[in-house]
Swiss-Prot record:
Gene name, Swiss-Prot/TrEMBL: betB
Family: Belongs to the aldehyde dehydrogenase family.
Organism listed in the record: Pseudomonas fluorescens (strain ATCC BAA-477 / NRRL B-23932 / Pf-5)
Domain of life where this protein originates: Bacteria
Protein name: Betaine aldehyde dehydrogenase
Residues bound to K(+) 1: 27, 93, 180
Keywords linked to the UniProt accession: Metal-binding, NAD, NADP, Oxidation, Oxidoreductase, Potassium
Length: 490
């Protein structure tokens, strides 16, 4: 018996049945409990959502900037009023610790929505003089109907990161959450409607990426796709979006990011930074700094600091606010992470901490994997080359600055990078040479609403957050005005 009622699609301002009886289960990864059955959208449901979005978008775009801003601000207020309720649901659905979802997921998502709500009246064009009798002006106009496809690790936050700039710019969005974690996005749709968003401006279609995601990316009347997920899937989404109708895309994809500890770093700060870069959210963060480079002569001391901190991690029931490390998001993902851990052992990396599934007591019911640290790693190991998306840190040693920069950049990914040093000259010199879109100096992980987020190389295309994301949900129309005589050559 599921804990919650059947979860339906959200189209045209309310819940509606899908076109078929097919459903999938939402599972609590902490104990295997079925939380709810969730309907699978059909291709006909996608078309229904597009028609609804087209109708709603015209109403939304015709509102004044201040009217749109006020509605989005009201949604922010409701999100904050229901923070704990939404955080509790997010914890059940994802397995993330409530101590995290309560203070981060909804809070930072609401911050992004508030940021863009404030920018709505600032969307403006330019006036360009040509001569005394003529000038050009530009308009930033909404794209129309856009699609958002979310990942499972930050469900409601990602839905807000994508919908906030899209709605602020006057678009309608059809959002497909991950099949693994669909519940809070449906609640977000309710909140938008309650805040006054016209029907159809934010529709939610649940189902698989192979089906619903593909139908969205191929739809000829959807103007843009914003996707968060793995690189392999992102390539397919981008190919489908461009081949169907030359859609614009934003791709926030995978990473295998380097964290460089320099020899002048405070080792306690370095260890704290490495812990946050690897074990926050049970290691399921795309920007994690899983390749930790340490000077050879500091390796033993750094390992001791890390082992001490790993021993302090409070693993347990994610609903307990004292817990700061919960299960992985699903049992299939747990098996994937355990496979990488086995590969690390097989290829000769030494296990400093963890390295196994947790099965004692209540842990046996859930997808719990011990925080794992490998040392004596080399650049050619699978655990160093491939994104694991779990609580697995790889410690590597180096000798010179030039060497570590070269090795840090020796990857197909380029999402994030960071370093720890007391020398700010070195910090900026090195950061400017690292091939990554998001970088931190003496810290890791913070992504403010004003900070553009995105990757280099195979870690993505375009940016989320910041003013650039708002602009990317608009298109520019140029208009020339002639006040003088017009002479034809014919």
């Amino acid at each position: 018996m599921a804990r919650f009622e059947l979860q339906k699609l959200y189209i045209d301002g309310g819940y509606t049945d899908a076109g078929s009886d097919a459903t999938f289960d939402a599972i609590n990864p902490a104990n295997g409990e079925v939380l709810a059955q969730v309907q699978r959208a059909t291709k006909e449901d996608v078309e229904r959502a597009v028609v609804s979005a087209e109708k709603g978008q015209k109403i939304w775009a015709a509102m004044t900037a201040m009217e749109r801003s006020r509605i989005l601000r009201r949604a922010v207020e409701i999100l904050r009023e229901r923070n704990d309720e939404l955080a509790a649901l997010e914890t059940l659905d994802t397995g993330k610790a409530f101590s995290e979802t309560k203070y981060v997921d909804i809070v930072t998502g609401a911050d992004v929505l508030e940021y863009y709500a404030g920018l709505v009246p600032a969307i403006e064009g330019e006036q360009i003089p040509l001569r005394t009798t003529s000038f050009v002006y530009t308009r930033r106009e909404p794209l129309g109907v856009v699609a958002g496809i979310g990942a499972w690790n930050y469900p409601i936050q990602i839905a807000l990161w994508k919908s906030a700039p899209a709605l602020a710019a006057g678009n309608a969005m059809i959002f497909k959450p991950s099949e693994v974690t669909s519940l809070t996005t449906l609640k977000l749709a309710e909140i938008y409607t309650e805040a006054g968003l016209p029907d159809g401006v934010f529709n939610v279609l649940t189902g698989s990426g192979r089906e619903v995601g593909t139908w969205l990316t191929e739809h000829p009347r959807i103007e843009k796709v914003s996707f968060t997920g793995g690189t392999d899937t992102g390539k397919k989404v981008m190919a489908s979006a461009s081949s169907s109708s030359l859609k614009d895309v934003t791709m926030e994809l995978g990473g295998k990011s380097p964290l460089i500890i320099f020899d002048d770093a405070d080792l306690d700060r370095a260890a704290d930074t490495a812990m946050m870069a690897n074990f926050y959210s049970s290691g399921q963060v795309c920007t994690n700094g899983t390749r930790v480079f340490v000077p050879s002569h500091l390796k033993a001391a750094f390992e001791a600091k890390i082992a001490e901190r790993v021993a302090r991690i409070r693993i347990g029931n994610p609903e307990d606010e004292n817990t700061n490390f919960g299960p992985l998001v699903s049992f299939p993902h747990m098996e994937s992470v355990l496979g990488y851990i086995a590969k690390g052992k097989e290829e000769g990396a030494r296990v400093l901490c963890g390295g196994e599934r947790l099965t004692d007591g209540e842990f046996a019911k859930g997808a719990f994997v011990a925080p794992t640290v490998f040392t004596d790693c080399t650049d050619d190991m699978t655990i160093v080359r491939e994104e694991i998306f779990g609580p697995v840190m790889a410690i590597l040693t180096y000798e010179t600055e030039e060497e570590v920069i070269r090795r840090a950049n020796d990857t197909d990914f380029g999402l994030a990078a960071g370093l720890v040093t007391k020398d700010l000259n070195r910090a900026h010199r090195v950061i400017h040479q690292l091939e990554a879109g998001i970088c931190w100096i003496n810290a890791w992980g913070e992504s403010d609403a004003k900070m553009p987020v995105g990757g280099y190389k195979q870690s993505g295309v375009g940016r989320e957050n910041g003013i650039s994301s708002l602009n990317n949900f608009t298109r520019i129309k140029s208009v020339q005005v002639e006040l003088g005589d017009y002479a034809s050559v014919f």
